[in-house]
Curated annotation (Swiss-Prot), chains A, B:
Consists of three domains: the N-terminal catalytic domain, the anticodon-binding domain and the C-terminal extension. Its main location: cytoplasm. CDD domains: ProRS_anticodon_zinc, ProRS_core_arch_euk. The keyword Cytoplasm applies. One of its GO terms (molecular function) is ATP binding. This is Proline--tRNA ligase. Transmembrane segments: none annotated.
Amino acid sequence: MADKITSRQQDYSQWYIDLVRSAKLADYSDVRGCMVIRPNGYAIWEKMQAALDGMFKETGHVNAYFPMFIPESFIAKEAEHIEGFAPECAVVTHGGGEELAEKLYVRPTSETIIWSSYKKWIQSYRDLPLLINQWANVVRWEMRTRLFLRTTEFLWQEGHTAHADPEEAQEEVIRMINVYRTFAEEYMAMPVIVGKKSESEKFAGADATYCIEAMMQDGKALQAGTSHNLGQNFAKAFDCQFQTKEGVLDYVWATSWGVSTRLIGALIMAHSDDKGLVLPPKLASRQVVIIPILKGDKEEVRAHARFIAKALNKHGISTFVDDSENNSPGWKFAEYELQGIPVRIELGPRDIAEGKCIVARRDTFEKTEVLLDAEMTENIEEILNNIQQNLYERALQFRQDNTVEATTWEEFKAGVEKGFVIAHWDGTDETEALIKEETKATIRVMPTDEEYRKQYNMDEPGTCIRSGNPATQKVVFAKAY
Amino acid sequence: MADKITSRQQDYSQWYIDLVRSAKLADYSDVRGCMVIRPNGYAIWEKMQAALDGMFKETGHVNAYFPMFIPESFIAKEAEHIEGFAPECAVVTHGGGEELAEKLYVRPTSETIIWSSYKKWIQSYRDLPLLINQWANVVRWEMRTRLFLRTTEFLWQEGHTAHADPEEAQEEVIRMINVYRTFAEEYMAMPVIVGKKSESEKFAGADATYCIEAMMQDGKALQAGTSHNLGQNFAKAFDCQFQTKEGVLDYVWATSWGVSTRLIGALIMAHSDDKGLVLPPKLASRQVVIIPILKGDKEEVRAHARFIAKALNKHGISTFVDDSENNSPGWKFAEYELQGIPVRIELGPRDIAEGKCIVARRDTFEKTEVLLDAEMTENIEEILNNIQQNLYERALQFRQDNTVEATTWEEFKAGVEKGFVIAHWDGTDETEALIKEETKATIRVMPTDEEYRKQYNMDEPGTCIRSGNPATQKVVFAKAY
């Protein structure tokens, strides 16, 4: 049963920790900065993996697996890459009881080890494109960790593609950030802003980084996925050339893109409440719990509960019955609210006599009566669809309510304490750094979505919110996880 | 297209390497002893994972994820365990640019890190059983590596369960080795012998190890899966006690069980031939290739091919069309034989006119005519089922043909050069070690399957094949991968 969860209002950070622990989603391990993803948390990851993997395959990608150890000399081949990643790597110096001739880095990301293979596999334009994804664990040494959001080891997928020309690579970059957007919005019920990162925020080794950014319930931003245009940087670092259709040699064009178990943290922070986890039905491994009220003819109540569960499962709605007598219905209500089961069905002898049951929604706590008739499965399905839709709309409304367009520095400073701020920026690293120093807010994204750009007149020229210099566009600022 | 594959007869080891490379299943990487699992190989692993994961869940298990780093002090807690595993570990000594206070071992297996969590999660019999599985990468430093069969890093699943009494733990051990048997026989079409390992071959830290052993086409044995009864060893090492139903404290009973990407090597060695990979249809991500013979009205032939592919896919048979004009039909035949596509359909204008197509089986190369009628999908399905069945029976026949019951030392020595030898053993470590030293053969398994025991009169007392001392039972000897 739930330990007491601190309320969001009282202490948002503590609420998050309490929730993750109480709902048994994850635990810190005895290894510094590493987490244990417990079965309840891992079940969410499995649903995410299944949906994403299907979308990757539909867009022509195949899975493969590359070594997790990267020789030090490989990491060093791409200058920006080593500068960005080497300081946060775990380093293997001994193996099989002996000191290694060359140190091995545990992959923080796999561009280098993968391009050392691509070099062998790609000779001609006929070998392109190469569209490969990998599901793997990666390690980035973190000083300050937070379950799911920032841990030394985490799970992710990383796509690595190779193309014959820059246009095709750029198409891939955009295709995949849009796949992430679709996943975030349609599965996670989490609205995101699609766009580009500023130079200072882009991936170490990329020409350009695209991202999806979401707003959490405390108004902070969370980067939920990235897609990088790597240009010819890694092909040059690994001397990966191919013969073009025209018969000349050129370096291969590359992309990479990834999302991680961080998405579980985003999911929690986007929707959950003071009673526990709130899961969008599409990512709930268990969508409906039936709690029989065991009075009168208990076996008859149980039989009805099982019958309904069977019908719902047959209809593709993942349902289970908790008919244990160790715990009271009230205890069970609280427990499954904590676990984020989207729909609870209460069923007692009187309900059965009246041919109905009580259906409680996790998102709104609204209770309705549903008839135990031939349309029941469809009615429950509709409720699940409504929950999915409502979570998205609620989160979108929240984001809109907590986004301000700042025209003064005072508005800006107040705005980033509360949510996203849309403001003019002069385009310089210096101003960006200054704003970060003074407010802890960073440029989260330079939106590329037309609708979003129009909504906030992002293309309107103006003066920079901090420097007062001319600015050609507005960008989105926020504090971030 | 295929590089030339060495024939099995000429050089079995080279045949294996050639096949793995030519069919693009895996590649050595630039990291010592580590492999790249290429998309064709990984697709097999994905099919294996899906089938096994389903079977684990049906038997009540859930997935979770534990850190891959294990503090040195944890490994040291179970005496036999550290002795067995420490010498083959990769060791992280630096992280985030600094030397670590305590070295971290990259997991060679996860008993220790998992039991350090179980200790926190288990207080009472109500918390038991705990039935958790993990899909992960592990590292065991190997001096002599072979793609899939023995590499420094490999992928696997490891189940770790906790129970309130030894009977339930033993039931779990047997349940899971039987799950592996079912998987090996029904999906991999690979007959296996189920049984116990001798003391010297059991897992470091286990009271007993059960295994499934398969025969490869060179007569060698391959251990394809293990299930360990860990007794209270790890619970004691991690001081994991629970309150029993009777209200007293006791140590928790444990099991662990695993299979790895080694199964892909087993699959190759069990069925494949000099033309390339032979895949059982249940593990083929692509089961049927349609090769249109592009003569006459090419577009009409193509349209028919696509129509058939659509019908087969709709029926749940994974089918694709190769209608490229860059390569000849003959080239395609060889290429898809190399890749192990179970069924090839050839379809030319004359076939279409006659309302039929040619269906070629990968396992027997047999060609039959199949009518392009309403029963076609079912006929193809039947052929796929026949292939699955035939591969199993062929492998079983091969195993029987290459198993000898030895009653003299000469017979024994000749037998282990060819396959499995069933012989009396006096039950001592000394004799076992002597036999290994003299013949390189080891005790692969002490069968527990009644049918197998009867077939070879394993319970018949006799005299030890090597020492001449009294022996209460026969066991299975072989050279092994």
